[in-house]
Amino acid sequence: MSRRPNFGGMGMGGMNMQQMMKQAKKLQAQMAEEQENITAQEFVGKSADDLVVATFSGDRKLKDIKIDKDTIDPDDPDMLQDLIIDAVNKGLSQIDEATQASLGKYTKGLM
């Protein structure tokens, strides 16, 4: 019968469960702070020539949208729709990039 190695109550490379929980709570607090920082920021997406400008909060809520009055053409609603989609997508992409840059260091290797 083989004996199991004795790690003196320690596991995971010498770190006990209490230390692991303390470290996990510390990381959780750091991640929450990073998320709060992102949420407090504003992100602005702009279409070509700034004809449509969409402003978001960091929690992905649309706060404002500005449409250049010369862009509104009743005969071409598709162009305005495309400009709005472009501005909104650019704003959301900025939030995603900021989130990845800020929180990616915590999730690296988990996915």
Swiss-Prot record:
PANTHER family for the chain: NUCLEOID-ASSOCIATED PROTEIN YBAB
Record family assignment: Belongs to the YbaB/EbfC family.
Record carries keyword DNA-binding: yes
Subcellular localization, as worded in the UniProt entry: Cytoplasm, Nucleoid
Protein's organism: Lactobacillus acidophilus (strain ATCC 700396 / NCK56 / N2 / NCFM)
Pfam families membership: YbaB_DNA_bd
Protein name per Swiss-Prot or TrEMBL: Nucleoid-associated protein LBA0378
Subunit structure: Homodimer.
InterPro entries reported for this sequence: YbaB-like_sf (IPR036894), YbaB/EbfC (IPR004401)
One GO cellular component term noted in the UniProt record for this chain: bacterial nucleoid
Keywords carried by this UniProt record: Cytoplasm, DNA-binding
Keyword Membrane applies: no
GO molecular function: DNA binding
Protein role: Binds to DNA and alters its conformation. May be involved in regulation of gene expression, nucleoid organization and DNA protection.
Major localization listed first in the record, in broad terms: cytoplasm
